[in-house]
Amino acid sequence: MLYLEDYLEMIEQLPMDLRDRFTEMREMDLQVQNAMDQLEQRVGEFFMNAKKNKPEWREEQMASIKKDYFKALEDADEKVQLANQIYDLVDRHLRKLDQELAKFKMELEADNAGITEILERRSLELDTPSQPVNNHHVHSHSLGEKRKHNPSSHHSTTDHVSEKKFKSEALLSTLTSDASKENTAGCRNNLSSSSTNNVYNVNASQPLTSYNISSLSTGAGAGAITMAAAQAVQATAQMKEGRRTSSLKASYEAFKNNDFQLGISLSRDSATYSSSALASTLTQTLTSSATTDSRSGRKSKSNNKSASQQSSSSSSSSSLSSCSSSSALAHELSHQQTAAIPESDTNSQVDWTYDPNEPRYCICNQVSYGEMVGCDNQDCPIEWFHYGCVGLSEAPKGKWYCPQCTAAMKRRGSRHK
C-alpha cells in the first residue's frame, strides 16, 4: 500500500511547474499593463494634436493605436489560456488523488469491513479543537512578573514541552485503543489467557521522555490501523535514499506538528492482546537503512493473509475466530516475509464513476487513471498518456516523446535533409 509514496513522487515537480507558470503569467500581466499605459498616453497626445495635423496623419495614428490595442488584447487572451492550463494541471492531480484514496479505501475495507468509517470519524474528532487541559498549576502574575526567569517557571515550561512531545508520540496508541473499543468489543472476552496484559499509569510528575513505543499494547481490532502505520514506515525505509529521507521527514513532522490535547488519563488495560512483536518490528523499521526499491516491496495480500491466519490459529484458542483477521495482520508484520509477488491487474482496478465533463487524455481518448507519462513536446495536443497505451511499464529516463510527436519529428528531419 504505497499510494502515498507514489502520489508524492508524482507531484514532486508540481510546485516548480506552478512557480514557472505563475512567473510567466505575472510577466505577461506586466507586459499588458505597460502596453495599456503607453496606449493611454498616445491616445491623449493624439487628441491634443488632432486639430493641428492633416487627416492623413490622423488616420495613420488611429490605425497604429488600434493595432497596438489588438496586440495587447492578444497578450491578455494568452494570459487567460495560461491560467486555464494551470487550473487543468491542478485539477488533474486532484482527480488522481481521489482515485488513489478510493483504491486505498477499498483495500482497507477488504481486510477489515467498516474500518474506514472508524478512521474517518476518529480523524474528525482529532481535527476538532478542544479546550486544553492544564495539568500544571501555574499562578497568574502580571506581565512583568511573567517575564522573570525563575526555577519554577522554567520547570513548568520544560514539563509543558515534554508533555507536548509525549502527546504527539502517544497518538498511535490512542488511535488504536479507541478503534478497538468501537470495532471489537465482542472480541475482548474471547482471547486466551496466555496473552499479555499491560497497565500503564502515567503521572505528570514522572519523566515523560521514558515513554517507549515498544511497550505499547493495542486491541485486536486495531491491528489494521497499526499494520497500516507500520507498513507505511517500513515501505518508506525500503525506498531509495532520496525518497526515504523526504518521506520519513514528512511522517515525523506530521506527528510532531499535531498537538492533540489528550486530557483523559492514559492508564488503561490493554485488550488482552500482546503486540510487542509488532512494536519491535516498527522500531526496527524506523532505524533500518535498507535501500531496496519501494515498488518491489509489495506483497501478495492473499498469500500473506492465509499464512498468517494458519500460524495464528495454531497458537490461539478456537474463540479467536471472530478476531482472526486482526490478529493475522499483526502476526504478518512480526515475520517480515521476503517473498514479493506482484499484484494482478484485476486487483488494481477500481470501479470509479467518472464525470462526463472530465477531460480525456491519451490515444485511447479516456480519462486520467493509473500511471501516466507526459510528452516533453510543448506543442503536443494530447500531452498525457497511460503507461499501457504507449508500451511503458515504468517511468522513462530523460525526455520522452509520444508516438505522434516522434513521427512528426522524423518527418521534419527527413524534409530538412
From Swiss-Prot:
Q: Which domain of life is it from?
A: Eukaryota
Residue runs in coiled coils = none
Report residue spans for region: Disordered: 126-165, 177-198, 284-320
Q: Where does Zn(2+) 2 bind?
A: C375, C380, C402, C405
Q: Which SMART domains match?
A: ING, PHD
Q: Which UniProt keywords apply?
A: Chromatin regulator, Growth regulation, Metal-binding, Nucleus, Transcription, Transcription regulation, Zinc, Zinc-finger
Main location as per UniProt: nucleus
Q: Which Pfam families match?
A: ING
Biased-composition ranges, Polar residues, are 177-187
Bias (Basic residues): 136-152
- The site (Histone H3K4me3 binding) lies at Y361, M372, D376, W384
Q: Which GO terms describe its molecular function?
A: zinc ion binding
Q: Do the record's keywords include Zinc?
A: yes
Q: Does the keyword Zinc-finger apply?
A: yes
Tell me which GO cellular component terms the UniProt record holds: Swr1 complex
Please name the InterPro entries in this protein's record.
ING3_PHD (IPR042020), ING_fam (IPR028651), ING_N_histone-binding (IPR024610), Zinc_finger_PHD-type_CS (IPR019786), Znf_FYVE_PHD (IPR011011), Znf_PHD (IPR001965), Znf_PHD-finger (IPR019787), Znf_RING/FYVE/PHD (IPR013083)
- Name one process (GO BP) from the record: chromatin remodeling
Where, in this chain's numbering, is Zn(2+) 1 bound? C362, C364, H386, C389
Q: Where is the composition biased (Low complexity)?
A: 189-198, 284-294, 303-320
- Domain commentary: The PHD-type zinc finger mediates the binding to H3K4me3.
Family the UniProt entry places it in: Belongs to the ING family.
Purpose of the protein: Component of the NuA4 histone acetyltransferase (HAT) complex which is involved in transcriptional activation of select genes principally by acetylation of nucleosomal histone H4 and H2A. This modification may both alter nucleosome - DNA interactions and promote interaction of the modified histones with other proteins which positively regulate transcription. NuA4 may also play a direct role in DNA repair when directly recruited to sites of DNA damage.
Record's protein name: Inhibitor of growth protein 3
Recorded source organism is Xenopus tropicalis
Q: Which gene encodes it?
A: ing3
